[in-house]
Design a protein with these regions (language model features):
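Nucleotidyltransferase catalytic core that binds NTPs
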Residues: 1-152
């Protein structure tokens, strides 16, 4: 079984790290989790793809070898099939609120067609409102965001 945790991580936040810490309780070093840093032409990113990959690698340094960080372009299902065709793949996703739930149900409907299963984890209460969008807004307005990101 292969666990993957995909996201744009633009930037990685304490909410992402919270989910990653929870993942460590269900996996072993025999089969590291692949953290997939997605790049999409349809999304406008604040940080370049390579920057986001490096941020995630720096953040997860303490958790290696439980995790490996990979970047990819394009469709998640195509990527899964090209990398792990003989594995049963489990996609890990974080859920904070009803908006996330609605989006994830649509996303799972798409990924389920490709036989990937999805498990959902919720962040700790102190991270329930932390999002990359919030951090980007704070960065753009010059507000303090240090307590929302692990890589400062």
């Amino acid at each position: 079984m292969k666990f993957i945790y995909p996201g744009s991580f633009d930037p990685i936040t304490n909410g992402h790290l919270d989910i990653i810490n929870k993942i460590t309780s269900i996996v072993t070093g025999d089969n590291p989790v692949s953290v997939l840093v997605m790049n999409s032409d349809t999304k406008k990113h604040m940080f370049a793809h390579e920057q986001r990959i490096e941020m995630v690698k720096k953040t997860l340094k303490q958790h290696m070898p439980l995790f490996n960080v990979e970047g990819f372009d394009g469709n998640i299902n195509d990527y899964i099939e090209s990398q792990w065709p003989k594995y049963d793949v489990i996609i890990v996703r974080g859920l904070r609120n009803n908006t996330d739930f609605d989006y994830e149900m649509m996303y799972e409907t798409f990924t389920r067609r490709f036989s990937a299963q999805t498990i959902y984890m919720t962040p700790s209460p102190e991270n329930i409102f932390v999002s990359s969008s919030l951090v980007r807004n704070l960065i753009n307005t010059g507000a303090d965001y240090d307590d929302l990101v692990p890589w400062i």
